[in-house]
Amino acid sequence: ELGPNANILVLDAGDEFQGSLFYTQYKSGPVAEFINGIGFDAMAIGNHEFDDGPAELLKFINAAKFPIISGNTKIADGSELKDKFKGYIIKDMGGQKVGVVSVLATDTGETSSPGDKVSFEDEVAYLKGAVKELQDQGVNKIVLLSHVGYVRDQEIAREVDGIDVIVGGHSHTLLSS
């Protein structure tokens, strides 16, 4: 067991709502209950979190006991998701300010059901601004919790200065040493 001063982030890159008979039968409530016990520091919204529309995602967000983030996901006025999640979090870890920022694939409107009040800003454009905003707040360690896929993660790594680590999802690409 890790001590209380362990400098560890527990992150989820999204897509908890897909691929199992369990989710198909029971939806987000039991999923939230189960993963609340894991102790995540943050979770990215994946495209499949929108599979049953914004209302089911809202139920999950309300049940979650950890921050759910997605910075380039833009919510229009009148949506039940308005102001329900942030683009990033800042954690104090061993006296260091660590930022965790998240983006979601811009084609989510085609791969899922986000509804007409949800749109997706270009990942690189959003991240350049978010990294600067985090750095302006004294953050010098930035983790990207990404749900855009391995190829896009590599492009982001080349195009956005200031990101130290990318924890990526979406493409389900196995990386080994």
Regions from the PLM with identified roles:
Residues 1-177:
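Acidic, metal/ion-coordinating pockets
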